Amino acid sequence: MSSVFLFISNESGKAIFLISGDVLVKSFCSLSDTCPFQDSCRSCSLLNAAKNYLAGTAPDSRIKTLDGELSAGIGEYKIGKNVLLKVMGLGSCIGVILSDVSTGICGIAHVLLPGASDRGETKYAETAIEKMVEDMVKMGARRSRITAKFAGGAQVFKHMSLDILKIGDRNAISVEETLIKKNIPILAKDVGGEVGRNVIFNPADGSMIVKYTAKGEVLWL
């Protein structure tokens, strides 16, 4: 049984669904805590529209199909085209998203440390961003049209005040300084705090979805 990722945006909200056959496998929804249907997704107009689209009973130009998903582990980055990109379990780490909307080519990095690496290690902010840009351009992205979004950098050791332990702040500063130095426009960011995050990039509309691991809050940026 084949599975498909669908992005839909209508007057109710926005959502990404992974549907296998007629079964909802997982979803990322802008309604989040305000969802009027709570756990009863069967009543959701977004999901019903997506299923009708798959069944061929209700063509909808507002629905877009995504070509799968890629997830970057700690110190890794992933590049793709028209794919959902994810970094999960961010504490002090930063999820950095680069995209060229004109080609649909995008990348995501799971940055662990600030600065650059002489050995090309992509766990460092500057090195990861440089390599992502290079690979995206090789894939067909236009350097002048690449933009950025990023999130993370929580202070996970909140009981410690030494500056050297504030790695989340240092990561966020390093990412921002690198992007500015490379003239890459920053369209959105969500950094700091004391709560971990999961970060997802939706190439269908260029949104960064930030899910707070403890609070359950979801942001679409």
Curated annotation (Swiss-Prot):
This is Probable chemoreceptor glutamine deamidase CheD 1. Probably deamidates glutamine residues to glutamate on methyl-accepting chemotaxis receptors (MCPs), playing an important role in chemotaxis. InterPro entries: CheD-like_sf (IPR038592), Chemorcpt_Glu_NH3ase_CheD (IPR005659), Cytotoxic_necrot_fac-like_cat (IPR011324). SUPFAM superfamilies: CNF1/YfiH-like putative cysteine hydrolases. PANTHER family: CHEMORECEPTOR GLUTAMINE DEAMIDASE CHED-RELATED. It catalyses: L-glutaminyl-[protein] + H2O = L-glutamyl-[protein] + NH4(+). Its EC number is 3.5.1.44. GO terms for biological process: chemotaxis. Keywords: Chemotaxis, Hydrolase. It holds the Pfam family CheD. Belongs to the CheD family. GO terms for molecular function: protein-glutamine glutaminase activity. It comes from Methanosarcina mazei (strain ATCC BAA-159 / DSM 3647 / Goe1 / Go1 / JCM 11833 / OCM 88). HAMAP family: CheD. The keyword Hydrolase applies. It comes from the Archaea. It is an enzyme of class 3 (hydrolase).
